[in-house]
C-alpha cells in the first residue's frame, strides 16, 4: 500500500501531537518533583531554636564568678547571697546628670573623725541582718591596659575610700575611714582583691562598687556618694559605667535603683510596725 502526501501529513501530525502530549506530561511530573524538593529544603534550612547560637536564651538567676581576663561578659554579677555583710552595692549611670565638679553628696549626721569603737550589740545585730538588695556599679577601663594601680589608688582615696577588710576598699561615714560602711569597691578580676604591697605593678580592667541593703542608715545618700565616686573614677581615668547586667548605665537605671531603695525602706518600716 502506497502512502500519498495526505497520508504522510496525517502520520506526521499524529507524531507531533503525541510528542507535545508526552513533553507536557514529562514537564508536569518534573515540576512536582522540584516543588517538593524546594519545600523540603525550605523547612530543612529553618533555624533550630535549641541550637542556634544567635538566639537569646531566657534570663536565669545564676552565680557568676569573676574571670581573670575581662571583657564585657566577664564583669561579676553580685547577688545578696554572694556578698559579705560589709559589701555595699548599687545603681548604674550612663546618662546621669551628675557633673564631675558637683560636690559629693554628704550624709546626714556626719560622724567624728576620731576612731570609735562600735557597740557590740549594734555590731551583732548588723551582722545578723540578711542582705536583701545589692546595688552594683561596674567601672570598665576603655584602655586595654586597664586602670594602673597608683592612679586608681589616688583617685579612690580622694573619694574617701580606705583599704580594709577582705582586702578591698570601703567608704565609711567619715572620710578618715571611721563610722559605718556606706559602700565598698572590689577588683572585678579574680580574686577580687587588691595588694597594696604591689600597687605599683598592679592594674585591672574593671572595678565594682557595691552597696548592700540593709546597710547604711541613710541608703539614698550613701548611694549618691557611691555614684559620684564611680563617675569621678570613670571621668578621670577613662572608664565606662556599667550596671550589674554589663549594660551601659543610664539615668533611668539610676532612678530604678533609687526606687529599689525606697521600696526597701518601705518594707523595713512595715516590718517594724
Swiss-Prot record:
Residues 111-120 have a biased composition (Basic and acidic residues). One of its GO terms (biological process) is FtsZ-dependent cytokinesis. Keywords: Cell cycle, Cell division, Cell inner membrane, Cell membrane, Membrane, Transmembrane, Transmembrane helix. Residues 23-273 are cytoplasmic. It is found in: Cell inner membrane. Gene3D superfamilies: ZipA, C-terminal FtsZ-binding domain. One of its GO terms (cellular component) is cell division site. Essential cell division protein that stabilizes the FtsZ protofilaments by cross-linking them and that serves as a cytoplasmic membrane anchor for the Z ring. Also required for the recruitment to the septal ring of downstream cell division proteins. Belongs to the ZipA family. This is Cell division protein ZipA. It comes from Ectopseudomonas mendocina (strain ymp) (Pseudomonas mendocina). The gene is zipA.
Amino acid at each position: 500500500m502506497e502512502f500519498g502526501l495526505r497520508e504522510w501529513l496525517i502520520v506526521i501530525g499524529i507524531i507531533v501531537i503525541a510528542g507535545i502530549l508526552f513533553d507536557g506530561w514529562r514537564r508536569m511530573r518534573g515540576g512536582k518533583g522540584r516543588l517538593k524538593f524546594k519545600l523540603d529544603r525550605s523547612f530543612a534550612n529553618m533555624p533550630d531554636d535549641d541550637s542556634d547560637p544567635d538566639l537569646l536564651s531566657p534570663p536565669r538567676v545564676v552565680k557568676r564568678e569573676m574571670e581573670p581576663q575581662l571583657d564585657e561578659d566577664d564583669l561579676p554579677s553580685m547577688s545578696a547571697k554572694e556578698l559579705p555583710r560589709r559589701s555595699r552595692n548599687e545603681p548604674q549611670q550612663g546618662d546621669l546628670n551628675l557633673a564631675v565638679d558637683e560636690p559629693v553628696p554628704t550624709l546626714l549626721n556626719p560622724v567624728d573623725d576620731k576612731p570609735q569603737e562600735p557597740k557590740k550589740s549594734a555590731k551583732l545585730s548588723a551582722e545578723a541582718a540578711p542582705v536583701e538588695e545589692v546595688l552594683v556599679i561596674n567601672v570598665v577601663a576603655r584602655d586595654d591596659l586597664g586602670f594602673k594601680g597608683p592612679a586608681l589608688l589616688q583617685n579612690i582615696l580622694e573619694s574617701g575610700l580606705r583599704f580594709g577588710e577582705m582586702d578591698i576598699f570601703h567608704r565609711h561615714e567619715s572620710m578618715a575611714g571611721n563610722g559605718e560602711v556606706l559602700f565598698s569597691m572590689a577588683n572585678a578580676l579574680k580574686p577580687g582583691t587588691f595588694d597594696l604591697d604591689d600597687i605599683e605593678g598592679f592594674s585591672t580592667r574593671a572595678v565594682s562598687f557595691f552597696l548592700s541593703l540593709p546597710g547604711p542608715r541613710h541608703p539614698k545618700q550613701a548611694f549618691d556618694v557611691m555614684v559620684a565616686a564611680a563617675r569621678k573614677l570613670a571621668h578621670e581615668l577613662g572608664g565606662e559605667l556599667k550596671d550589674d547586667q554589663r549594660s551601659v548605665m543610664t539615668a533611668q537605671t539610676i532612678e530604678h535603683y533609687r526606687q529599689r531603695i525606697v521600696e526597701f525602706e518601705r518594707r523595713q518600716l512595715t516590718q517594724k510596725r
